[in-house]
Amino acid sequence: MKAVVIDQKLTYNLLKNLRTKISNILRATSVLAFFCAILILIGCNKHDNPESNPKNSSYNYSIPEEKQDGWPVTSVEDVGVDKVLLEEAISKIVDGDFVNISSILIARDGQLIVDELFRTTLDANDAAVRNTDLNVHTMQSTTKSFASALIGIAIDKGFINSVDVSFYTLFPEYNRFENWSDSKNDITLENVLTMQHGWHYNEWDYPMESDQNTLFFIYSNYSDFVKGLLDLPMSSEPGNSFAYATMASHALGAAISGKSNKSVPDFAQEYLFGPLQFDTVYWLFSPTNRAMTGCCLFISGRDMTKFGQLYLDKGRWNGEQIISSKWIEKSVTKAVDLNFGFTDGYGYQWWMKEFTVDGQSIEAFFAAGNGGQFIYVFPSLNVVIS
């Protein structure tokens, strides 16, 4: 596990890249949603001639490498997936029909069946954490779902009482807040988890360099991002409206550290990443030395997929209950109805989507980050795709 402290200029560049407009998510999701639909068909239908090879296929399937990382591996055919259709689908990535896909991993029935890496060069995000492994990738806002998991563990372990706790009471180190109103006392931890906090917050509809962009406003005016969030004025009653807020997810990590007396990287390693046998982990830190739990985790595709499998298996991994099943269920249950195209709902830092394929309705929950970082979980198919 590695934690990297970055300077203000680099922090800004990363936050600028992080800013996630709905249109960006839709573009990335349209590709993955189409690919997910293909994979759903693979799981539900058999090719007419499974012995044939795809015409002019540029991809030949092979079983994932077996590593000492907790993942059992097997062939797609062993779990009822048509290899020919899979090769046809992945060939579209290899041939450039779908761009900017760095990797694709698929698990079915608790076994890793696809592990393919497509990217061949590192980028500026890798340079920020001095990453040299092509398999390790920025999670962007997918990090938020990990922050939710850590909150669940903190509640399971008794560090935090419940999601009903007043959010401001989690930060006793502050004795004064700007724009105070009594409604701030009514913001609960659950309100923050579901992005129904009530603060005047908008990071989607304005350019990053605009003071109307709350993410940029806090970055520009506060070295302590948590204080910047807590100082914001209210625009609605808590629990009444959805406002996506990266800084709110960042504050979740600060709450965990404050109540557990452990840094987020140490807490995550002890209670989540260690039990899941994560290999390489990088965190970026804010100017006040807090892990940036709203955006800035770096892990491998295999470990991403483990996280999805953990949620599919209701908090269990290799026989160990890492997060309570109650927390998992609550996290992926729709708390907010949305109609953004790429999603129809939001839970505890997880998105929901119902797909319709060949007249069949298939529900999914997923973690999402700008640039196409996704962990899709299809419970009815027993499938995880990342």
Q: In which residue ranges do the predicted regions lie?
A:
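N-terminal leader/targeting segments and the immediately adjacent pre-domain N-terminus
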Residues: 42-127, 155-161, 194, 223, ...
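Active-site SXXK
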Residues: 110, 133-163, 192, 252-256, ...
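Active-site Gly/Thr loop motif
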Residues: 278, 332-384
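N-terminal secretory signal peptides that target proteins for export/translocation
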Residues: 1-26
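A small/polar active-site loop signature that marks catalytic segments
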Residues: 202-285, 294
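Active-site-proximal alpha-helical segments within enzyme catalytic domains
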Residues: 248-255, 295-317, 373-386
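Bacterial N-terminal signal peptides
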Residues: 30-40
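Active-site helix/loop module of the DD-peptidase/beta-lactamase fold
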Residues: 157-199, 231-234, 260-295, 299
